[in-house]
């Protein structure tokens, strides 16, 4: 993808770089057991949109960002904010997180709900995988 510095293998909606940092992997193990925030069994586009609209900061940011923007969410976890920012826009949203288990939930939700303008990167925040000055908002 055009936001990556180097090519990474892609599995569905997730680009993957092996996370090697010992401290980061401790965090990964924690969130493996307790993904946050998790999805409810009845969550869909409308429930995520409702949750996002109730959050003042996310709602105002989505309005401020407008359209045709490249937006990066660092530490996206299960991707609920990334997905919220993608719903109803033509923005390109990228969520980055070291926890593959959380990203699997995010990618699965996006695919199940036909949200095509969001992708995810499984990498450490300190990995140099993103192009400089590509994103309009972080």
Placement of each model-derived feature along the sequence:
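Conserved SAM-binding motif I beta-strand of class I
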Residues: 92-97
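Conserved SAM-binding strand-loop segment of SAM-dependent methyltransferases
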Residues: 114-126
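N-terminal auxiliary segments of SAM/dcSAM-dependent transferases
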Residues: 1-37
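A short acidic, Gly/Pro-enriched loop at the edge of an enzyme's catalytic core
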Residues: 129-138
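Conserved SAM-binding loop
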Residues: 106-107
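Conserved class I S-adenosyl-L-methionine
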Residues: 67-77
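Conserved SAM-binding loop of SAM-dependent methyltransferases across substrates and taxa
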Residues: 78-89
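Conserved alpha-helix/loop element of class I SAM-dependent methyltransferases that forms part
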Residues: 43-68
